[in-house]
Amino acid sequence: MPPKKKLAAVVKVQLPAGQATPAPPVGTALGPHGVNIMEFCKQYNAATESQRGNIIPVEISIYEDRSFSFVTKTPPAPALILKAAGLEKGASTPSRSVAGSITRDQVREIAQTKLPDLNTTSLEAAEKIIAGTARSMGIEVK
C-alpha cells in the first residue's frame, strides 16, 4: 500500500457548473499552490456538466506534491430557493417586504436536494432550515 499523500491546503470556491475557466476565481485560488489549473478545470467541468446553470460549491484538497482531489457539494440553498420562486434576488428589506413565495412542496424538494450537505438527517428539520433561509430572504412559504 503506497504511503498517504500529505495535505498542503484545502480551497473552497463556488463555480458555475460546467463552466470553470483558468481566469479568476479559479486561477487566483489555485495558482499560489502550484496546481495545474487547466487540469482542474477539465475535471470539474466534466464532473458538473449535468448540473449546468447552477452554482456548485467545490472543496479542493491540494497535496504537497501539487496533485489535487475535489469534492462537489449541492448548490447553495438561497440559489435553489430563488430558482424555485422564479426570482433574481430576495427582498431588500426581508422583515418588511415580501419578494415572492414558494410552496411547502418546493421547500420539501429543496430540502431533499440539500440533505447530504446539511447538518441533519431528518427531512423535517431540513425543511425547517430551508424555510428559515427563505424567510430571511423575504420569500414567503405557503
Swiss-Prot record:
HAMAP family on file: Ribosomal_uL11
Family label: Belongs to the universal ribosomal protein uL11 family.
Q: Which SMART domains does the record match to this protein?
A: RL11 (SM00649)
Q: How is it modified after translation?
A: One or more lysine residues are methylated.
GO molecular function list:
large ribosomal subunit rRNA binding; structural constituent of ribosome
Listed under GO cellular component are: cytosolic large ribosomal subunit
This one is known as: Large ribosomal subunit protein uL11
Q: Which superkingdom, per the lineage?
A: Bacteria
Any S-S bridges, and between which cysteines? none
Matches recorded under InterPro entries: Ribosomal_uL11 (IPR000911), Ribosomal_uL11_bac-typ (IPR006519), Ribosomal_uL11_C (IPR020783), Ribosomal_uL11_C_sf (IPR036769), Ribosomal_uL11_N (IPR020784), Ribosomal_uL11_N_sf (IPR036796)
Residues in a coiled coil are none
Protein's UniProt keywords contain Cytoplasm: no
| Function (record text) | Forms part of the ribosomal stalk which helps the ribosome interact with GTP-bound translation factors.
Keyword annotations for this protein, in alphabetical order, are: Methylation, Ribonucleoprotein, Ribosomal protein, RNA-binding, rRNA-binding
Gene Ontology annotations of biological process type: translation
Q: Which NCBIfam families match?
A: L11_bact (TIGR01632)
Q: How does it assemble?
A: Part of the ribosomal stalk of the 50S ribosomal subunit. Interacts with L10 and the large rRNA to form the base of the stalk. L10 forms an elongated spine to which L12 dimers bind in a sequential fashion forming a multimeric L10(L12)X complex.
Query: Which SUPFAM superfamilies does this one have?
Result: Ribosomal L11/L12e N-terminal domain (SSF54747), Ribosomal protein L11, C-terminal domain (SSF46906)
